[in-house]
UniProtKB/Swiss-Prot annotation:
Keywords carried by this UniProt record: Early protein, Host cytoplasm, Host nucleus
Species this chain originates from: Canine adenovirus serotype 1 (strain CLL)
InterPro entries associated with the record: Adenovirus_E4_30/34
Cellular component GO terms, alphabetical: host cell cytoplasm; host cell nucleus
Domain of life assignment: Viruses
Description of how the protein assembles with itself and partners: Interacts with E1B-55k.
Family membership: Belongs to the adenoviridae E4 30 to 34 kDa protein family.
Name of the protein this chain belongs to: Early E4 31 kDa protein
Its job: Plays a major role to prevent cellular inhibition of viral genome replication by nuclear bodies. Assembles an SCF-like E3 ubiquitin ligase complex based on the cellular proteins ELOB, ELOC, CUL5 and RBX1, in cooperation with viral E1B-55K. This viral RING-type ligase ubiquitinates cellular substrates prior to proteasomal degradation: p53/TP53, LIG4, MRE11-RAD50-NBS1 (MRN) complex, ITGA3, DAXX and BLM.
Subcellular location: Host nucleus; Host cytoplasm
Length: 265
């Protein structure tokens, strides 16, 4: 039903894992820090030779934020990725580490769009419920990955996930459970890194997709308040002040974690 462990899955207590790579990401990735993770769609992102090297030892948990006593939105954060092989000292695992680190360094640089186009989050989340919340974007290998965090009451969670899946084809995006949250990731192949008009068209397209998703979810029925929440306004303000003016806000005070992801709904 939902993508599970290994190349398209999530980390859990039963899965053996060890930290295999750590990278420092610029502050434009800190929108993901509020969710404690940057999910990585390995099957979509990796070249064939990279898939052969990484095998089935990665998961959609992707990059996990390394929390410390002073995690500030205005500072670059450290992120770690886990490997699920059985021997962290094996030659195969050690050889993967450097390749994986270089891949991650390239991947996180695709988050520049979150700072360059701050209006994108404000526009996409305007008059939209917190249950389907745009978090951030990654531009990587000519594809724009658009991340939405999904959070519904446990009583309707499963039905909502299925409703969203009915609206999203594999070419359009993917719905999955990661370590801390459930996610919808849309894929846009027409965005140009230097073309404002293309990104603006993308934002309208994304809102139309989310409108379709909301209509499907509301058939369950579920009451969704189509307004910009005060919590989202606080997040937008904190991110803008951090990225533009270097104002520090503690990530722990703003972070979002979906309890359903831990309870395996």
């Amino acid at each position: 039903m939902f993508h599970n462990c290994r190349m398209e899955g999530s980390c859990n207590a039963e899965t053996t894992s060890h930290v295999t790579a750590v990278v420092r990401a610029p502050i434009f990735c800190n929108c993901f820090a509020l969710c404690l993770e940057i999910p990585i769609l390995w099957d979509d992102l990796l070249y064939r030779h990279e898939k052969l090297l990484f095998g089935g030892f990665t998961c959609n948990g992707g990059a996990e934020l390394i929390l410390n006593s002073h995690c500030c939105l205005a500072d670059a954060q450290m992120w770690q990725v886990h490997c699920h092989c059985s021997d962290s000292l094996s030659l195969q695992c050690l050889s993967r580490t450097q390749v994986l680190k270089e891949f991650l360094e390239e991947f996180v640089m695709g988050g520049f769009v979150n700072k360059k186009y701050l209006w994108y989050r404000e526009f996409v989340n305007s008059s939209r419920p917190d249950e389907i919340n745009y978090v951030g974007s990654i531009m990587f290998r000519n594809i724009h990955y658009i991340y939405f965090r999904l959070s519904f009451f446990s009583t309707v969670h499963q039905a909502c996930m299925l409703a969203i899946q009915r609206c999203i084809s594999p070419e359009l995006g993917v719905v999955f459970k990661s370590t801390y949250n459930y996610w919808l990731v849309l894929k846009c192949k027409s965005c140009s890194l230097q073309n404002y008009c293309a990104l603006k068209s993308c934002a309208f397209w994304v809102r139309s997709i989310i409108d379709r998703v909301l209509r499907e979810v509301e058939k369950i029925p579920v009451v969704l308040h189509r307004t910009t929440s005060k919590a989202e306004e606080r997040r937008q303000t904190a991110l803008k002040q951090a990225m533009m003016y270097g104002r520090c806000r503690h990530i722990q005070n703003l972070c979002l974690v979906n309890l359903n992801a831990f309870l395996h709904f």
